[in-house]
């Protein structure tokens, strides 16, 4: 096989063909999309396609994220409330420490006590998704200031703040689960979503042994942490 033929099939000599075709032109992008739709692209190829797309759209994604972030900081009721609650505890989250960046791992965002909030601009589906993500990370910031969370060494602390963030941010409300994630249950949907996302987050931490360990830790703190809606009077969304 010639070099050009190998390149057109998204593979190199000695490497398995993933179905991904490198290239930024419109025709190549459409060929990749049709390859995905036809089931001819492997999971590795799909990831290659996503990475190339994210790099190509990085400037536009970050600009859109920053514009929506600034709008939400000014007009979103939940974001403004969380900002005020954090400020009352001596913290300050604003456009200068809520960063929109392209992320290489598949997550929506993150919180670091020393730096602020990271929003993965290439993972944001729309402004509603960004609002949920900002609210989630702001709950972490609030918990860090109010409860002195030990992020590195205490899995129970991590589980508790993940339960609260998923419950209070709005990311587990019924409409979000139904239309975006394909979760069709009507009863106990909110609790199941919160539990599922908390277990996944705890499982990803270095101190967690396996999924059973993550589930055990979440169960140990579930009742008290799920009932704790501070700084809200009740679950807002």
From Swiss-Prot:
A divalent metal cation binds at residues 136, 140. The keyword Protease applies. The keyword Cell inner membrane does not apply. It is a peripheral membrane protein. Keywords: Hydrolase, Membrane, Metal-binding, Metalloprotease, Mitochondrion, Mitochondrion inner membrane, Protease. GO terms for molecular function: metal ion binding; metalloendopeptidase activity. Its EC number is 3.4.24.-. One of its GO terms (cellular component) is mitochondrial inner membrane. It holds the Pfam family Peptidase_M76. Belongs to the peptidase M76 family. This is Mitochondrial inner membrane protease atp23. It comes from Aspergillus niger (strain ATCC MYA-4892 / CBS 513.88 / FGSC A1513).
């Amino acid at each position: 096989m010639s070099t050009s033929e190998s390149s057109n099939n998204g593979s190199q000599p000695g490497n398995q063909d993933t179905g991904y075709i490198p290239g930024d032109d419109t025709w190549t992008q459409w060929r990749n999309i049709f390859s995905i739709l036809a089931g001819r692209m492997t999971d590795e190829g799909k990831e290659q396609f996503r990475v190339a797309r994210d790099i190509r759209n990085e400037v536009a994604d970050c600009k859109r994220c920053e514009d929506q972030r600034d709008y939400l900081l000014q007009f979103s009721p939940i974001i403004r409330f969380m900002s005020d609650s954090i400020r009352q505890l001596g913290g300050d989250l604003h456009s200068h420490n809520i960063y929109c960046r392209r992320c290489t791992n598949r997550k929506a965002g993150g919180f670091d006590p020393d730096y602020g909030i990271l929003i993965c601009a290439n993972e944001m589906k729309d402004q509603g998704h960004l609002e949920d993500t900002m609210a989630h990370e702001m709950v972490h910031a609030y918990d860090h200031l109010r409860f002195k969370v030990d992020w590195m060494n205490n899995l129970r602390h991590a589980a508790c703040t993940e339960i609260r963030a998923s419950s209070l941010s709005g990311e587990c409300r019924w409409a979000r689960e139904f239309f975006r994630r394909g979760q069709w249950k009507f009863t106990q949907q909110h609790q199941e979503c919160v539990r599922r996302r908390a277990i996944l987050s705890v499982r990803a931490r270095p101190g967690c042994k396996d999924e059973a360990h993550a589930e055990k830790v979440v169960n140990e703190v579930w009742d008290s942490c799920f009932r704790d809606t501070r700084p809200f009077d009740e679950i807002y969304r």
